[in-house]
UniProtKB/Swiss-Prot annotation:
Organism: Pan troglodytes (Chimpanzee)
A GO BP annotation: protein ubiquitination
Lineage per the UniProt record: Eukaryota, Metazoa, Chordata, Craniata, Vertebrata
Any one Gene Ontology cellular component term annotated for this protein: cytoplasm
InterPro entries: Ubiquitin-like_dom, Ubiquitin-like_domsf, Ubiquitin_CS, Ubiquitin_dom, Ubiquitin_ubiquitin-like
Name the record gives this protein: Polyubiquitin-C
Alphabetical UniProt keywords: ADP-ribosylation, Cytoplasm, Isopeptide bond, Membrane, Mitochondrion, Mitochondrion outer membrane, Nucleus, Phosphoprotein, Repeat, Ubl conjugation
Record-listed cross-link Glycyl lysine isopeptide (Lys-Gly) (interchain with G-Cter in ubiquitin), residues: K6, K11, K27, K29, K33, K48, K63
Gene3D superfamilies, alphabetized: Phosphatidylinositol 3-kinase Catalytic Subunit, Chain A, domain 1
Domain of life: Eukaryota
Residues the UniProt record annotates as site (Interacts with activating enzyme): R54, R72
Molecular functions (GO terms): protein tag activity; ubiquitin protein ligase binding
């Protein structure tokens, strides 16, 4: 078709184009005709600046449409956009770009629709029709991006006098907006207001939805204490900075003051007091930081990295993080991607539940590590705690509360510091980082509270070489603590240590006093035989069990160990590793299961069923299956019946290709469902997919894969829904129902991935 391009001088150029031509192609055609380099061209249609990677049809540009050509002002510039998760996006813009243009660029980079974006600069929300220069936004300025949530609601604000104020708000209102509404109602200036929710001081720039404040939530209003004070900040170089602060200043405020004095950006600062990393949203008074206290300043390690988070549904999320990110930050990033509130998230790594205030580097989580995400069970319950004096305390808890939370509740009721509490259930000492549900503590269970004996003592540890190590311990130290002390002295990892006393191997969760180990007792240290190893078994409830095994153990042996720990009969256990169901008679080494591998435990559903498999020749095969059978199992049954090797089978249900490691129930395949069997063309191959951000993804495909299959693989890797993906090859947009071979896409071809504009054609 023909289109016209009108320049500012009034000249009109005629171009021959196709709807699938990209803006980049159009600029190349203009360069051919007029000699203007593409990087100096800006094309405008219907008041919108057109982006290089998009096509004419994306913008509904039809035959004889007229585009306007504007030459770029020299003075393109970079700006930064900071999200609530702390991630910073860099954008190439011009002073004349509208806020709408900027939101479109953010959509291209992050996939967030413009109508869900609110941009804030200098405390002001920016309007779509205005330009960056209208707001005096200059190069390297930082905008803040807040996500809009839909729908108004009422909340309550309770003052210290007991008065309750009702406010009309939206989830996307900032705390600053809320304070302005309070000023309208009560006349209290915003800078004298501190708002508290769930024990946390709320920050001006954050929104109600950031804090999970929902309809009819109650905030508490506290007036700021007047009264400044000095504190000191000590850097790693030994330099001490003096700051003027107020007890009500947030850690974020303090970091801003440090930036003013020292030029260190807040996102590179970590502040430590009393051994604890301080969180941005808390105040100095929350941490009991008083006049002339000294904080320690540590610079964040540079070096972003990717980690993976695996959910119980098998979905894997990729996150951009830094080693210095706290677990709380990671949960906020997961909330941004998946919408799961942080208080419903439990993150597990190496079998351990991760605590909010600790950092990734504290847990030695490195690039491409995989965390496991378990959702907290809803549903409060009462438990009882019995003290040695016979007194019984009643506590309101949730199954997902950690032992640490429970000790804090006991401290609230009884005033006993957590570090003096030991909680016992079913004869076992409970560990701080574990949850009530990990120990199967249910409603109306009774825990026993024992106070830790004060008073350290020395014990000796004798190694097989005859060397004797002296340790300072307390009777209430766990065996795990003792192993950590040995690691500090001797460098032997705890998982290679076995401690023996009175002929008995000591268990990690028990204490020295449980074994009657007294001062000057001698323990014997034996190193674990190589070949002995730990593996993890993850259940569908998210619980992780640790087993001591050897590579030569059979799957049958492993099931027996699980029965010992969990009481589940072996014939109800199915173990899955690397997407494969493990057979009883084989060994761990047969499956290349190594130390710290994670197996998945699925309980067998009682009740087989029949399904049908229809081939391209029209033949229908009947199979006996269970909902818990994997697709791999089904292919093996087809091989038994028809002799077709599994690697030549592709199974389709409801238009979707089924993956080997998933089960029939994952795909909601029920009795008498019909699957379709397609034979694979020989010849898997790799192709590349390049995104507009420049990232390249590698995919394993076959020439017979449909474009729909390819989009599903991209979703698995990148989390981008297929309906937001457009794939371009050789300048053409690829259609879902066609195959790679239809488009002559061969091994190592590169496709281009463009995100769909909402409402595009």
């Amino acid at each position: 078709m023909q289109i016209f391009v009108k320049t500012l001088t009034g000249k009109t150029i005629t171009l021959e184009v196709e709807p699938s031509d990209t803006i980049e192609n159009v600029k190349a055609k203009i360069q051919d005709k007029e000699g203007i380099p593409p990087d100096q061209q800006r094309l405008i249609f219907a008041g919108k600046q057109l982006e290089d990677g998009r096509t004419l049809s994306d913008y509904n540009i039809q035959k004889e449409s007229t585009l306007h050509l504007v030459l770029r002002l020299r003075g393109g510039m970079q700006i930064f956009v900071k999200t609530l998760t702390g991630k910073t996006i860099t954008l190439e813009v011009e002073p004349s770009d509208t806020i709408e243009n900027v939101k479109a660029k953010i959509q291209d980079k992050e996939g967030i629709p413009p109508d869900q974006q609110r941009l804030i600069f200098a405390g002001k929300q920016l309007e779509d029709g205005r330009t960056l220069s209208d707001y005096n936004i200059q190069k390297e300025s930082t905008l803040h991006l807040v996500l809009r949530l839909r729908g108004g609601m009422q909340i309550f604000v309770k003052t210290l006098t007991g008065k309750t104020i009702t406010l009309e708000v939206e989830p996307s209102d900032t705390i600053e907006n809320v304070k302005a509404k309070i000023q309208d109602k009560e006349g209290i200036p915003p800078d004298q207001q501190r708002l508290i929710f769930a024990g946390k001081q709320l920050e001006d720039g954050r929104t109600l939805s950031d804090y999970n404040i929902q309809k009819e939530s109650t905030l508490h209003l506290v007036l700021r204490l007047r009264g400044g004070m000095q504190i000191f900040v000590k850097t790693l170089t030994g330099k001490t900075i003096t700051l003027e602060v107020e007890p009500s200043d947030t850690i974020e405020n303090v970091k801003a003051k440090i930036q003013d004095k020292e030029g260190i950006p807040p996102d590179q600062q970590r502040l430590i007091f009393a051994g604890k990393q301080l969180e941005d949203g808390r105040t100095l008074s929350d941490y009991n930081i008083q006049k002339e206290s000294t904080l320690h300043l540590v610079l964040r390690l540079r070096g972003g990295m990717q980690i993976f988070v695996k959910t119980l549904t098998g979905k894997t999320i990729t996150l951009e993080v830094e080693p210095s990110d706290t677990i709380e930050n990671v949960k906020a990033k997961i909330q941004d991607k998946e919408g799961i509130p942080p208080d419903q998230q439990r993150l597990i790594f190496a079998g351990k539940q991760l605590e909010d205030g600790r950092t990734l580097s504290d847990y030695n989580i490195q690039k491409e590590s995989t965390l496991h995400l378990v959702l907290r069970l809803r549903g409060g319950m009462q438990i009882f705690v019995k003290t040695l004096t016979g007194k019984t305390i009643t506590l309101e808890v949730e199954p997902s509360d950690t032992i640490e939370n429970v000790k804090a509740k006991i401290q609230d009721k009884e005033g006993i510091p957590p570090d003096q509490q030991r909680l016992i259930f079913a004869g076992k000492q409970l560990e701080d980082g574990r949850t009530l549900s990990d120990y199967n503590i249910q409603k109306e269970s009774t825990l026993h509270l024992v106070l830790r004996l004060r008073g350290g003592m020395q014990i000796f540890v004798k190694t097989l070489t005859g060397k004797t190590i002296t340790l300072e311990v307390e009777p209430s130290d766990t065996i795990e603590n003792v192993k950590a002390k040995i690691q500090d002295k001797e460098g032997i990892p705890p998982d290679q240590q076995r401690l023996i006393f009175a002929g008995k191997q000591l268990e990690d969760g028990r204490t020295l006093s449980d074994y009657n180990i007294q001062k000057e007792s001698t323990l014997h240290l034996v190193l674990r035989l190589r070949g002995g190893m730990q593996i993890f078994v993850k259940t569908l409830t998210g619980k992780t069990i640790t087993l001591e095994v050897e590579p030569s153990d059979t799957i049958e042996n492993v099931k027996a160990k699980i029965q010992d720990k969990e009481g589940i009969p072996p014939d109800q256990q199915r173990l899955i590793f690397a997407g494969k169901q493990l057979e009883d008679g084989r060994t761990l080494s047969d499956y290349n299961i190594q130390k710290e591998s994670t197996l998945h435990l699925v309980l067998r559903l009682r009740g087989g069923m029949q399904i049908f498999v229809k081939t391209l020749t029209g033949k229908t095969i009947t199979l006996e299956v269970e909902p818990s059978d994997t697709i791999e199992n089904v292919k093996a049954k087809i091989q038994d019946k028809e002799g077709i090797p599994p690697d030549q089978q592709r199974l389709i249900f409801a238009g979707k290709q089924l993956e080997d490691g998933r089960t029939l129930s994952d795909y909601n395949i029920q009795k008498e469902s019909t699957l379709h069997l397609v034979l694979r063309l020989r010849g898997g191959m790799q192709i590349f997919v390049k995104t507009l951000t420049g990232k390249t993804i590698t995919l394993e495909v076959e020439p017979s894969d449909t474009i729909e299959n390819v989009k599903a693989k991209i979703q698995d890797k990148e989390g981008i829904p297929p309906d937001q993906q457009r794939l371009i090859f050789a300048g053409k947009q690829l259609e879902d129902g066609r195959t790679l071979s239809d488009y002559n896409i061969q091994k190592e071809s590169t496709l281009h991935l463009v995100l769909r504009l909402r409402g595009g054609v």
